[in-house]
Each structure stands twice: as C-alpha cells, then as structure tokens.
Amino acid sequence: MARHSFFCVDGHTCGNPVRLVAGGGPNLNGSTMMEKRAHFLAEYDWIRTGLMFEPRGHDMMSGSILYPPTRPDCDVAVLFIETSGCLPMCGHGTIGTVTMAIEQGLVTPKTPGKLNLDTPAGLVAIEYEQDGQYVERVRLTNVPAFLYAEGLEVECPDLGPIKVDVAYGGNFYAIVEPQENYTDMDDYSALQLIAWSPVLRQRLNEKYKFQHPELPDINRLSHILWTGKPEHPQAHARNAVFYGDKAIDRSPCGTGTSARMAQLAAKGKLKPGDEFIHESIIGSLFHGRVERAAEVAGRPAIVPSIAGWARMTGYNTIFIDDRDPFAHGFSVA
C-alpha cells in the first residue's frame, strides 16, 4: 500500500478555481508536452481524478502541474488537468498558474515581466504586471484560433433544433448565439444549461468530425459556449461556458474567449488591434485583443491575447492513499 503526497497552491482566476501542483507530480516521458500529456493520461490519470474530483476536489475544479520545458524558447512547461481530462490549453488555468508560480517563486523568468509557456497546444507567450510580491494582471498570447465550422444543426433538449458555430481557441467550442429556439443565456437557469450541454456535445461529436489540422490529438468538441447580452458596462458580450460533465466556468474562459474572437473575426466583426471584453456568468471580465492575423494549415486564423487576474487562496498538502476506497475520486451524476 502507498500514500502519495501532493503539495498544491490553491487559487482562482476571476472566480474559477486553479489548483497548482507544485510538488509530487510524476516524471513523464516524451519529447513534447503533447507526448508527455499522452503518457500522463495512459499511466497517471488517477492523479488527475484524485485531485480534481470529490472528495478532494469538486465539479468545477481545474489545475496544472509544472514541468521543465521541452523546447529551448520556453521558461517552463505546464500540463493542464481538470475534471474533463487534460486540456491541451487552458486560459484561466494559465493566468492562475502564472500568478501563483511567480508569487511563490516556483518559476524564475529569464526576462522579468515576461514568460514563455510550453503547453500541449504550443507556445503561449505571457506578459505580467507585478506590484511587489503580487502579480496583479496576466496577459497571455494564445495559440492561433480559427473558425472551424458555421451553422451546424443539432437537436437540443427542450429547445429543439438549433444551429451552432464551432471555433478553436485551444479547445473546440460550440458557440450558441441568439436564434429562433434560443434567446439569451439569461433566459435559462445554469442548471438548464448544465443539463443540455453534455447532450448537445455528444450529439455534435457523433454527427460531425472535429479535427485540428495540425495537432492529431485534438480531435473532439469539448466545450459549449452559451452567449448573452453583457450586463457589465465595459463588456462587449457575456457567456456561460460548459466544460467537464456538469461545470459552468465562473471566469469568462480564456480559450473560449479566444474561440469567440476567432468566430467574430472570421465574420468581419473584429480586426487586428480590436479589443473584446468578455463577461462571465458571475460578472468577472477578461480583456481580449486580436493581436494579428494568422493562418493554420491554410485556414484563416487570428492570434488572440487574453488579460485577467488571479488570487491565491492557500496551501494544500493532499494525500492519495491506497487505503482510501475513494483514492481516485468520484463524481455524483
């Protein structure tokens, strides 16, 4: 029998949790972070489920594990873990991870105020603002984002037939905008969105193929982004992003905001240099910006950036003990 210990720094980004594993993570094989991600999923996924699910976590829990970079142009590598699996990229997770890693001295940037992250989705460039010991703001320049498909038809429980656009911003998102059978996220409860989203996701994945043209391992739709009119006076739009099995992102969602900007840019509603302020279901804001035009395997794309803040909430030494019948976690349907 064995007891495995994990030293974690807990915090949140604009309201959504981030658990940074600062000690206890496994050594992983692979020459890239995508290969290391595959090794983790094949051999160590019990760490993810044990730390993310109940009784040590909860339905909204997400986190990260730090590793030495696999490429010379990066300061540190990050593996993202959450209840839904190991995401190739996580925007709110990046902002929280960078904030806590800098404040706790877990990462020493080569250039103060700047950091390059090695993620499974690719290089993510970071700029951060620090006041004394505290990081007040983080801006990440994400991987290229693009509109993948428009007007995909799918049957949604209770609502009936709806159409969605699918965009990539580090993960694939189905974007639900106002239409005949859907008005605004505010017209439905969070419980309704949580009930409909996994069915919608399953039906879309069964009916359509979602394949990143350059990254073979990114081959399914993972998130649903429900849109709405903003309530905050600075915001351009509001969203409720569904992920995992029953979670609504409390932050505006970084990769979701990237996907949304890519969708709007593809339709001529955003251009390089434009800002896009995205509001979450709890009213927190991410400040997005279209940095420049790009291309992914011949497909028009943008390079988006996202700025937000995070706060540390405490330290946590977590045991995963083989004697515990719930060592690897559980989720109640």
From Swiss-Prot:
**Annotated positions binding substrate:** G91, H92, D249, G254, T255
| Record-level Gene Ontology MF annotations | 4-hydroxyproline epimerase activity
Q: Which reaction does it catalyse?
A: trans-4-hydroxy-L-proline = cis-4-hydroxy-D-proline
EC code(s) of this entry: 5.1.1.8
Q: Residues in the active site?
A: C90 (proton acceptor), C253 (proton donor)
- Fetch the Gene3D superfamilies from UniProt: Diaminopimelate Epimerase, Chain A, domain 1
Q: Which UniProt keywords apply?
A: Isomerase
Would I find Isomerase among this entry's keywords?
A: yes
Asked whether the UniProt record includes Isomerase among its keywords, one would answer: yes
Q: Which InterPro entries match?
A: Pro_racemase_fam
What is the enzyme's class at the highest EC level?
A: isomerase
Q: Which family does it belong to?
A: Belongs to the proline racemase family.
**Which PANTHER family does the entry link to?**
TRANS-3-HYDROXY-L-PROLINE DEHYDRATASE
Q: How does it assemble?
A: Homodimer.
Its biological purpose is as follows:
Allows intracellular utilization of 4-hydroxyproline, one of the major constituents of host collagen, by converting 4-hydroxy-L-proline to 4-hydroxy-D-proline, which can be further metabolized by intracellular 4-hydroxy-D-proline oxidases. Strong B-cell mitogen. Plays an important role in the regulation of intra- and extracellular amino acid pools, allowing the bacterium to profit from host precursors and enzymatic pathways.
- NCBIfam families referenced in this protein's UniProt entry, alphabetically: PRK13971.1
User: Could you tell me what this protein is called?
Assistant: 4-hydroxyproline epimerase
- What lineage is on file? Bacteria, Pseudomonadati, Pseudomonadota, Alphaproteobacteria, Hyphomicrobiales
